[in-house]
Amino acid sequence: MRDREVPITMSTWLRPTSILSNALRTVAAWVGLAVLTVAFPLIADTQAAASSGQSRHINAQRLQGNLEKLSEFGRNPEGGVTRLGYSQTEMDARTYVMGLMKEAGLEVRVDAVGNIFGRRAGTARLPTLLFGSHIDSVPHGGNFDGTVGSLGAIEVIHALNDAHVTTRHPLEVVIWTNEEGPHFGISALGSGVAAAVLGPEILDRKDEEGLTLADWLRRYGQDPSHLTDARIPRGALAAVVELHIEQGPQLYETKVQIGVVQGIVGLKRWKCVATGVANHAGTTPMNRRKDALAAAAKDLLAVRDVVRSEPGRQVGTVGYMKVDPGAPNVIPGRVEFPVELRDLDSATIERMWEHIQQRFAQTDKEEGVETRCAVINDTAPAISDPSVQSVIREASHSAGLSTADLPSGAVHDAGEISRLTPMGMIFVPSRDGISHAPQEFSTWDDVANGTEVLYRSILSLDKQMNAR
């Protein structure tokens, strides 16, 4: 099964540089370190190929300023942000971003679920090229997740306007709503509704305050009864592209500047319950116990062992355990825990689960318990369109940037929209692979590199899609 490994392929283009230009870059690097704001962690830029930014069409300073301003909405004292979907903080941030869209000359609208679209007309009657991301965050999240792709998309429009470039396809910048999901427990909510994956059944979902999604939509000024109006018709889109931070360590550790995403991994999640017998912890001999927690602990290690035994980059997680009755002097009689498996290949997920079930059955026999599992989430992999991958790769190389092909282990809105149209994603490095935390960071040079690749990719797609 070695062929299931996802190789990291690298191509680095070196430019001849003079002694003078190297000296100027050294001085500029020291000066640049002084102007980083306290809103973002400090890091010296180790990426070499694009440090001068001489060939960029986008305005890196404008982009940085807009991102720094956005980071003020929901800023936490310890750094990072808390900007949950459908919260007042996110509403305020949305108002700011819609203002940026209008400044870029976009025609702005909000759909029935709260997704924001900014449209730039094309010169021909063609399907729309869609690109953007999200601005909501997890609790105590970082400043770059989603925001780089959202404001990077707006910067692409600015750059096109600055250069007086027209496109044949209409262009739409999209800010998807509630991508992270902690508010209602539904990830990629806005894009899921747009792709007809989610429907009116989600309107009664409640948050921790007891408010339903329908309640929040009314606060947005939307009519919940029109939720399905947010669905994007098939044939309306030419392609979707999302710029995002990697949220993993591969690009940062290998010093590769751009990730060309092969696809977004599939995710399957089970709710498991191990049932034993609750009994007195002091009077029940060890050889007479039916300890549900002991069994669940073995099950957790079984998940880890099975996933590690597979060649490739698959992952498996047991994220929590709920122990009942949860007292220090009572043998646990019931334990609830989830099992989550992710891989770019659905067959690999199913094979791992079969082996995990065999291990669970063995543990049940050893510990005298019964473990039952039920599927609660099953999301198929979203494979990037090969032609869009090629466009992104060529756009990177034309800008003198190194590339690597890699999968996305995280869920993204582009994956939902891939059900409707060809999809591609652009990754930029995340320092130490940290994300969903205040320490999340990508250098400004990497952010600008990714936005430049997005700019070039959109122009290439505009030309190539016409020829099909």
Give a label for each model feature.
Residues 23, 27-41:
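Bacterial N-terminal signal peptides
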